[in-house]
A protein has these predicted regions:
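Bacterial N-terminal signal peptides
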Residues: 7-16
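Mature catalytic domains of secreted/periplasmic carbohydrate-active enzymes
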Residues: 22-579
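Residue-level detector of intrinsically disordered/flexible regions characterized by low predicted structural confidence
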Residues: 4-5, 421
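Positively charged n-region of N-terminal signal peptides that target proteins for export
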Residues: 1-4, 21
Length: 579
């Protein structure tokens, strides 16, 4: 009997491997790299979009925008109901304790991450990022406990990082051997997070940032320009054959770092800037590799949607979508994004009988089937043209010491977004071992206390007829500073006359003061003055959420005047419900 089971299991394993290999052939061979910056990019405007020959789940959605927009039923109500989520932006780059983009920056001599890497691991020609992966061990990571904490803080969904620009998959990946099950923690971290979300009835999405890995990683193909190691190549140049007898034998570094593309104009120069993508264009001498890269990109996402059933997916970028030939999509043009979306929506139809997921495409124009997102800042006015999520990290996207943890900054960030008809996802920094700092825990608990009192003004809400009122600076309403949440936001001063609005699911109007009024201070809501024309009926009731007593108020030509109770014990933002 055991022999029969073994044979069956072996057959299934071989079948699974052969299926994966048939969908994604081996990485094609490439010619030796030419001199840095010696090759012009192909013209992306004249390059016709390639249609990938990948099978997708049967259904009405086809891998083109026309079909997706025609068949998508609209953004699900659950996103508006949820409003606030936590981003689990965690992976091996936390090991460097150098903030965001540690993997790329450790290969830049003038960067703090390079200095930190030298102290912790050694020189990147000898001990590179691949070796960081091997030793990374987040042994204190407890997705169950963290999901419970995040839910207590008021979050109603999680955004879970599947793969960052470092190209290392945090699940049991079919198409990327450099993953958390094979190398490093030996854990399917995505499965652990998904199980925790199911346990606590939380929605969750998976984020994918590997679209521009191929030009992002070009620093790994360089070398020091000065010192004892000047001219000694970093480990990006290594091949499968170089691994013989080493710990990474059998793992091709090209599957992690990609290939040397510095021959194209601007690629090397842009790799050493703080951010900028290369010049728009096509890697025209590497079209076979580009096609393979795009297929692998798509198949990895489809692997997750098939086996982990996320409530939404997220792709990073700065333009209309991945593989557009410009911005972060520089290098190739193809319908990889449309292929992934069509497969995902058809799969939901097949599994559930309906579609209630969505696809986040960063900075895409209003498109039925896509949700927009952007980092840090807020629009100047209400934006109801398309559903959107505003994202930001507390401290940074990956851990570093000495972050400022301030509940008021998180709360005001949430208010600024929802008053503009948006949603929120905030990253909580996690130490390399997967734990979070005590000050961070206290911050989350304080946010949760505020949400317990004021959640009815947040969940399911929409923007009111006007964004808010208060001090005007350079012709615009004063708002919380953008950027990563830290000392700047914690020190920023509002007063009780800085006001934001939302409308609740039952039609109630909510007035948020961006600072707690002083005892018996008169707060005047000028937007409710008769000449503004915003109110369609008389005010019958004013309640202060979290306060059991009555509130003194009157309606005048100046607007709604409210006296803040002297015995109210509230923090950060007082919220009045108007009916």
């Amino acid at each position: 009997m055991n022999k029969i089971v073994t044979i069956l299991l072996c057959g299934l394993l071989v079948s699974g491997i052969s299926t994966a290999q048939s969908l994604l052939p081996p990485m094609p061979s490439v010619a030796p790299a030419k001199n840095v910056g010696s090759v012009e990019m192909g013209n992306s405007d004249k390059f016709e979009e390639v249609q990938l020959d990948l099978p997708i789940t049967d259904g009405p959605f086809k891998p083109n925008w026309q079909s997706i927009e025609a068949n998508y039923p609209g953004t699900p109500q659950w996103l508006r109901d949820a409003k606030f989520g936590i981003w689990v932006h965690f992976g091996p780059q936390a090991a460097g304790e150098s903030g965001d983009w540690y993997a790329r920056n450790l290969y830049k001599e003038d960067n703090n991450a390079y200095a930190n890497h030298l102290k912790r691991y050694g020189h990147p020609s000898e001990v590179g990022y691949k070796d960081v992966l091997r030793t990374w061990n987040p042994d204190k990571l407890d997705p169950d406990a963290l999901t419970k904490l995040y839910q207590k803080a008021g979050a109603r969904f999680l955004m879970i990082q599947g793969v960052h620009h470092d190209n290392y998959d945090l699940w049991n990946s079919k198409y990327q051997p450099w993953n958390s099950v094979n190398i490093g923690p030996k854990r399917d971290m995505l499965r652990e997070w998904a199980d925790a979300c199911h346990k606590y009835n939380m929605r969750y999405g998976v984020t994918f940032h590997h679209e521009y890995t191929w030009w992002w990683w070009q620093t790994a193909f360089g070398s020091d320009k000065q010192g004892d190691k000047a001219g000694v190549p970093y480990d990006g140049h290594l091949t499968l054959a170089d691994g013989k007898g080493k710990w990474w034998e059998g793992y091709d570094p090209r599957m992690l770092y990609g290939i040397d593309l510095r021959e194209y104009e601007s690629v090397d120069a842009m790799a050493h800037t703080g951010w900028s993508p290369p010049k728009a264009g096509i890697f025209s001498h590497h079209l076979e590799y580009a096609n393979w890269f795009a297929k692998q990109w798509a198949l990895r996402i489809m692997d997750v949607t098939e086996n982990y059933s996320p409530d939404f997916i997220y792709t990073d970028g700065t333009v209309e979508g991945p593989f557009t030939g410009n911005g972060t999509g520089t290098g190739y043009k193809c319908n990889a994004m449309q292929t992934v979306m069509a497969d995902y929506y058809n799969r939901q139809l097949k599994q559930k009988g309906f579609v209630d997921g969505f696809s986040i495409i960063k900075f895409r124009h209003p498109t039925n089937g896509a949700v927009n997102t952007a980092e840090f800042d807020f629009p100047d006015t209400i934006n109801s043209i398309q559903p959107w999520i505003r994202e930001a990290p507390v401290g940074d996207w990956f851990y570093a010491p000495n972050f400022t943890y301030h509940a008021g900054s998180m709360i005001r960030f949430i208010i600024e977004a929802i008053a503009r008809d948006g949603n929120v996802a905030l990253n909580i920094p996690m130490r390399p071992d997967g734990s979070i700092e005590e000050a961070c825990v206290r911050m989350l608990e304080d946010v949760g206390k505020w949400m317990d009192i004021n959640g009815e003004a947040v969940y399911g809400s929409k923007a009111w007829k006007t964004l808010g009122e208060g001090e005007i600076i350079n012709g615009k309403l004063k708002k919380l500073p953008g950027g990563k949440l830290g000392g700047g936001q914690a020190r920023f001063k509002f007063d009780a006359q800085d006001i934001r609005f939302t409308e609740g699911k039952d039609g109630s109007l909510y007035v948020f003061t961006m600072e707690i009024p002083s005892a018996e201070q008169k707060v005047v809501v000028k937007s409710m003055a008769k000449d503004k024309g915003y109110l369609s009926s008389e005010i019958k009731e004013v309640r202060l959420l979290g306060y059991n007593g009555n509130v003194s108020w009157k309606y005048t030509n100046e607007g709604l005047e409210i006296i803040y109770p002297k015995d109210a014990q509230l923090c950060t933002s007082a919220v009045f419900r108007i009916r």
